[in-house]
Amino acid sequence: MSTLIDNHIEHLSKLSDKKICRILRIKPSKDIDKNDLITKLILDHYYGKPRLGNIIVIKSLQNGGVRNWEFNLEEIDSNNRQLDSTIPWNNDYSLREIQNTLNHRYNNINQDLVDLLSVDDMNNSLNTDFLKKFYTYFYIGNYNRDKLCQTMKTFAKSTKKVTSNGITKNKTVGKGAAGIAFLAETNSGSFEFVIKAMNNVKQYRNKSLDIGTILYKSELPLRSNVKNNHLEYLATDVMRTVELRYPGYSGYNAFISNEGLLYLNSANDNFTNQTIMHIVLNRILTQYDNDHFIYQFDAFFCENRSGLKRGTSTLTNKITLGKTNSTNVKQTDGYNIMEFANAGSLDAILDDWSKSINIDSNYETLLFMFNDIFVQILKTLKILQQPKFAFVHGDLKTKNIFVKTDGQINLPNGQVFPRYIYKIADYDKSSITWNGIRFHNSGNLGTNIIGKLYDNLNTLDLTSTVDSNYYYLTNICPFIESCTSIINGIELESIPIRYLPIPFYSSIDVYSFVTSMLCHKIFHNFVDYCLVRSIDNEITNILKHLFTETDLNIVMDHINNTFNSNKKLDLTKYGKIISIIKNNHIGLRKNINKIYDIYGIKLHMKETRTVVPNIILSADQNICLDKCKLNTCNIIQSTRYNRLSDQCYWKSTNSETQELHISDSDQIDREIDSDEQKQIIDNLFNDIKQQSKK
């Protein structure tokens, strides 16, 4: 089938845009990309027009005035004047002064984050300020006339050390398909920071973040509405899958609607998603005095406005699934200003150790250093993988763990060694739930379509038919592999892990991290040294819990064979690391809480959610922000659905919050057998089913 699709694509690519539009029966537009048109034709042909007709919409919007949810240039300039004082990068400030300046703005962001979806006492409506105001918190510059953006342009053009507007770029520290990163410092050299540029930011001009809804109903009919990103499934098909992945997730993050159990999500481009992750992680981890993440100082945009006239805005747009409206700005880049990890990456450090350390004479020292790495990473994941957050990094590997020095320590052999702080970085593909909204990466057109084609998300359970405590990535591929031609190079295994609005198994990050560690000779040989001599320690105990004896031997042999063939393992791509697990049909545990017990990692700030708020859905499945009055309610604005209000749906709901019986924290933290888990899920489902009928 894949060959047929490739041939079909090759044939269609020779046709003109105009002819393809005529086949699709849509009006030609310069804003509609030819690849998107071809994708639409391919999907219509191979997956059925009636089915895809409800999934994908490609159309031209009619000309009109500036939409009330879209920035125009006057708004941008006005907003920038308020933010100018919080962009101190060309001033000779100390790091502390810059942090204090930026914290003033972050206080506003944090308060909106805390209040997200709470009920405003003043007007008795849902608070959505974090969504509505998100992009107004950030400076939007212009490559053509703005000093800050001109500096970024200068940095991008130069391959050498260069100074512009009070900032010096020392060197380029990273470059890839998504963008480029510079190491910079103030003129006085008082401190260094990293500027990470990510290209092709799509949605910032729409001001607000879009919300999608997934409704799990106890009965038919299902009324999915792509126009406002509303999908409906039978709860019996899907809810059990969510709870098997993340026991307790529904209890923390579900809402009771007038039609059934409701989950919310917000899908965003790479830069927007990364910026949101930084804000949320900073909020969560600082409460636990955890410093094992890269801190974001600031974020801003630079756009090329050469095609714009003052007072005008883009008037012709395309809407395709997760994509939001494009603008006639030729290119917009997003910039994150982040702390500098002065010791490089864990990947580079392990490579250095591989060249210089003898295991036999340095066993105790290596065990100490490896335990230090594992403790710092695992205690951070333990916090973020609570059911209320359900964090999935989606790209956790040694190259995405940065290292900072903080004084010195004495090793077991008496040697003085730098004290390393290991920091998890690169969150553009990550996902997390906050106050009931799942923030995740939207992917591209192809990944969005694949996500929508899962009519029954229960297929994403991936549970082993032999042992229900394990899942297999091999079970992902049969469906997705038929769609390889439309996902534009995205690794197949990453699609359900990164791009779907329900969380993947939390254990996947631990497995990708451990597998990437094993791809370094020093760690692989250390583990082999311990296994051959039957040495029990924290590292081997973790590996023995994660893998069966047979699977661990398979993984070790696979990597060792690669070493012996003198092939260098490619640790830059997540798919290459995950493929070691997938291609060898390695079973992955769903519940890995025992590995945290090995290091005595416990949480001291657990929160429980004993009530589940109601959210009323309107007649067109939009979220009502307030109670219905005269059969009408105000609704959340959307770039796809430009309305402020909607008719109320005839099926009413109790306005009071509902009790939801969930498994307690002890049940969530320990490994539950399949029968007990099924009973918990059945009880939860029955509670929700009864409450949704009230």
From Swiss-Prot:
It comes from Acanthamoeba polyphaga mimivirus (APMV). The lineage of its organism: Viruses, Varidnaviria, Bamfordvirae, Nucleocytoviricota, Megaviricetes. Belongs to the protein kinase superfamily. Ser/Thr protein kinase family. PROSITE patterns: PROTEIN_KINASE_DOM (PS50011), PROTEIN_KINASE_ST (PS00108). One of its GO terms (molecular function) is protein serine kinase activity. One of its GO terms (cellular component) is virion component. It comes from the Viruses. It is found in: Virion. ATP binds at V173, G174, K175, G176, A177, A178, G179, I180, A181, K196. The active site is at D395. InterPro entries: Kinase-like_dom_sf (IPR011009), Prot_kinase_dom (IPR000719), Ser/Thr_kinase_AS (IPR008271), Ser_Thr_kinase (IPR053235). This is Putative serine/threonine-protein kinase R679. Keywords: ATP-binding, Kinase, Nucleotide-binding, Serine/threonine-protein kinase, Transferase, Virion. Its EC number is 2.7.11.1.
